[in-house]
From Swiss-Prot:
Alpha(8)-beta(8). The alpha component is a flavoprotein, the beta component is a hemoprotein. InterPro entries: CysI, NiRdtase/SiRdtase_haem-b_fer, Nit/Sulf_reduc_fer-like_dom_sf, NO2/SO3_Rdtase_4Fe4S_dom, NO2/SO3_Rdtase_4Fe4S_prot, NO2/SO3_Rdtase_4Fe4S_sf, NO2/SO3_Rdtase_FeS/sirohaem_BS. GO terms for molecular function: 4 iron, 4 sulfur cluster binding; heme binding; metal ion binding; NADP binding; sulfite reductase (ferredoxin) activity; sulfite reductase (NADPH) activity. This is Sulfite reductase [NADPH] hemoprotein beta-component. It catalyses: hydrogen sulfide + 3 NADP(+) + 3 H2O = sulfite + 3 NADPH + 4 H(+). SUPFAM superfamilies: Nitrite and sulphite reductase 4Fe-4S domain-like, Nitrite/Sulfite reductase N-terminal domain-like. Keywords: 4Fe-4S, Amino-acid biosynthesis, Cysteine biosynthesis, Heme, Iron, Iron-sulfur, Metal-binding, NADP, Oxidoreductase. Pfam families: NIR_SIR (PF01077), NIR_SIR_ferr (PF03460). Component of the sulfite reductase complex that catalyzes the 6-electron reduction of sulfite to sulfide. This is one of several activities required for the biosynthesis of L-cysteine from sulfate. Binds 1 siroheme per subunit. Binds 1 [4Fe-4S] cluster per subunit.
Amino acid sequence: MSQYPIKPELQVQGQLSDNERLKAESNHLRGTITTDLKDEITGGFTGDNFMLVRFHGMYQQDDRDLRAERAEQKLEPLHNVMLRARMPGGIIKPEQWLAIDEFAREHTMYGSIRLTTRQTFQFHGVFKPDIKPMHQMLNKIGIDSIATAGDVNRNVLCTSNPVESELHQQAYEWAAKISEHLLPKTRAYAEIWLGEEKVETTETEPVLGDSYLPRKFKTTVVIPPHNDVDVHANDLNFVAIAENGQLVGFNVLVGGGLAMTHGDKSTYPRRAEDLGFIGLEHVLKVAEHVVTVQRDYGDRVNRKNAKTKYTLDRIGVDAFKSEVEQRVGVAFGPSRPYEFTHRGDRFGWVEGIDGKHHLTLFIENGRLLDYPGKPLKTGVAEIAKVHKGDLRMTANQNLIIAGVAAEDKAQIEQLAREHGLLDNVTTQRKNSMACVSLPTCPLAMAEAERYLPTLVTHVEGILSKHGIADDHIILRVVGCPNGCGRAMLAEAGLVGRGPGKYNLYLGGNTAGTRIPKLYLDNVAEAEILAALDSLIGRWSVERNPGECFGDFVIRVGVVAEVKVSKTDFHA
């Protein structure tokens, strides 16, 4: 029940989706998870608990490569969970890293650590007997996975910008404060996983509400001109405005999001909308009330239209903004000027204004594993054993060894080189990204992570063929249209349709401020590569000075520019 007057005309009327029943009946996210944990007959969670464990930071999965074989043997799928940690701003200490490295090696099916586009890490392939010990291990080192999935505010991202150290520290602190402020207040996580004794009290969720949010909600803190967090993929963004190197406030961008459903034209990716400027004293209240307005007016009837972007388009940006202002008790000021110019990570060594050095390592697909001749995961662990600063996961699935003193640079660099963490990589490969997809993601329709290295090699060949091997396009591949790999902000984005088949979208830009448009529908690799060969060839000779590939394909009419997603994206 909202503490604010509700305007029924702004709500979607109709029978609530079953997820709303599930949340309302869950006893503040407890369900019967503890009962399922004791059930040794199945390796999975049953009924409502299958969805409820998401609010605790886990997705139930199975290895889809093994499904058919296990079905033939009359066995259930090889149920396990993927855990996503809550790491606002992606900062992790060396001793924490060594603990998660050991757990991944000893207690997961795949032995890997996966850095993700949510600026955190994931464990894949954790079996039921190891789930509770996993949470207890994380708690012991000061990490949890509360609200990294489910209809809540997810892990809060923050620009990975160690160069401007003071400004980055301020932005990071706001990311951490926002994360804490928007967390569920239920003690379910502590009771179920950490053995906290249940206290008989009347629990309430003052921000999220007792039925939580209509859909997932994503938040960022970003320092222009770097858009490494891809603001337009997120529901709520705080764009840092600085004067003389000091943070003075934020422009607030609301309503970004990339997920859609194939064949459903009521769904589409959308850029975030700039509501205006706020001072630092209002940050937490604004964050809270963007969330409460979405809580009260988001669509709880049709989950496909439940995200903030659809609420904005349905009730109008002005109505949404006005409602937030009324609840906060402050009007947004005029937006302050800023510009995004790029979103890639800065690889190699950079020196911060505080004299500390930072080494950004390229981790293809964010997958840290010991490969033949490239023991990447061991390499990071060896660095963590001697490193005196911290490690920072980026929203581009890479890793920064941050805060290195000048006298320690040589040792860190030697360890990185010895373990294949500083191999020569093309600019194209550094600007390509994929979601996890098969074999673990239950939503995957086509390969993504396992296909990307091969696809990039093909694209590198095309660039070289046309004499522009040092150039690149922002290339992203996702296994389904839910958007985890942010393909709908790429210059060339592949979205899985079925085994070996993708939609090809073109026309994003290097700064991540434009949605691409469908160019080829449901096609295989040969057709995709032929199209890219032709268009990259044209780009190499017809482009204007400094013109990126995405700008070029729009200028010459290959695809139309998506200005307003609701009307343009499917047109």
